[in-house]
Amino acid sequence: MAWSLMNIGTAFSQNASLGIFEGNGDVGTSLKPGSVHYDSTQKSYTITGGGENMWFTKDAFHFLWKKVSGNVSLAADIQWIGTGGNPHRKACLVIRQNLDPSSAYADAAVHGEGLTSLQYRSSAGDLTHEIQSYIKAPVRARIEKNGNYVSMSLARENEELQPAGGSFRIQLTEPFYIGLGVCSHDSNVVETAVFSHIEIKTIESKKLGEPMLESTLETIAIASTDRKVLYTTRDHIEAPNWSRDGKYLLFNSNGLIYRLEANSKTPQVIDTRLAIHCNNDHGLSPDGKLLAISDQSKDNKSLIYILPIEGREPRLVTSLGPSYWHGWSPDGKTLAYCAERKGQYDIYTIPVEGGEEKQLTNVPGLDDGPDYSPDGQYIYFNSERTGSMQIWRMKTDGSGQEQITKDDCNNWFAHPSPDGKWIVFLSYEKDVKGHPANKDVMLRIMPVGGGEIKVLAKLFGGQGTINVPSWSPDSNNLAFVSYRLINP
């Protein structure tokens, strides 16, 4: 039995010899038709597919599928047949709204060259984006839809599946399609992959205990909004800073500051001596030689200290607390921070050497997150003085305070890019109070001179995602932390 959808060149069939799946066919236009062979003895599927790509706003590939609803996962061993072909050919575990070439979808894609990515199109006709994993050429992959979030796990040879890090938010209407796909990345040829040890599981909603937290350190390219996983852990990590030379990242975890070198998967502790209760407000001096930390070891009140980036006994800067570091002036002479004095949180500055602090804001409600513009003319901050949390800026002496964002989101932690062109910030939904952890949030970006606000990423995060400056030195990328709650 066969039929055609409205999309020209897209045909699908249902066949009783497809094992646990219901149908298969070419999605989009493929000059060479694909096929599926099911080995009922081995319970494996050999899928041949053509198609130009699964990317941009539409896809072309061969798809073996079944309809499902609810929270579900699909896992399989994946093996390419043949060593040649296009390095960008894709063998995929696919979750898809429908069989239209421009459908919303997510897939765990193993490329011919070994690159493995969690790819997605949030809605029909949108551009495709991806989260690249640091795990190359896995032998087994799993894609999981839990609520409105999709994530991926991977396994190398002789290893167990492990989280690949990162997840994204996508809304699919039930029922939707789940299955296996192959794209040759060249419409003139076909490629073949074997999928075996297939598991399709319903994810139970029962909670047997407290969920476990998974933290992922990621970067996002500003131009493409594609994401790359650098590090994933079951520890709680927060607030990345990018080094001035671009060679490493900092983050805090369990009261300590860690340094992760480029291409390394083993963070190293920076020796902060007695400061062992560091929070997520820390960052580097303009020359990259000094580190500012906010530590709560003394009387559980956050105080600001400075130490060499190599580590050493910290030097106290603020004698009053709580004080939370957020910005370093481009000339290296002044620190900006949020502090509570007499029951009110406002923005303050203080010389790097310490001394008398200067109060820059003094209005009812919280003012937080001060960060300097790269030319040293302005301090950007977030304030709830108008009833919701919005982005503001002022001159460095506190004068000329003006509102930058005016929308239905609660916007936090504005960070100007090093080239002075962009402001990135964290946005919560309008009914969220404060900046809690483990919420649906967005990373958003806008031109410094005003203009359209665009979404960089929708993720599960909040507190700890981008509390402090995290731009790459060339302004092309942003570092952040995303989170995932895993039921035991």
Predicted regions and their residues:
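Sequence signature of WD/YWTD-type beta-propeller architectures
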Residues: 204-488
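Bacterial Sec-dependent N-terminal signal peptides
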Residues: 1-14
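Short hydrophobic/aromatic-rich motifs at helix boundaries and adjacent loops
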Residues: 1, 91, 415-416
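Extracellular glycan-recognition regions
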Residues: 14-207
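Alpha-helical interaction segments
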Residues: 2, 44-46, 53, 370, ...
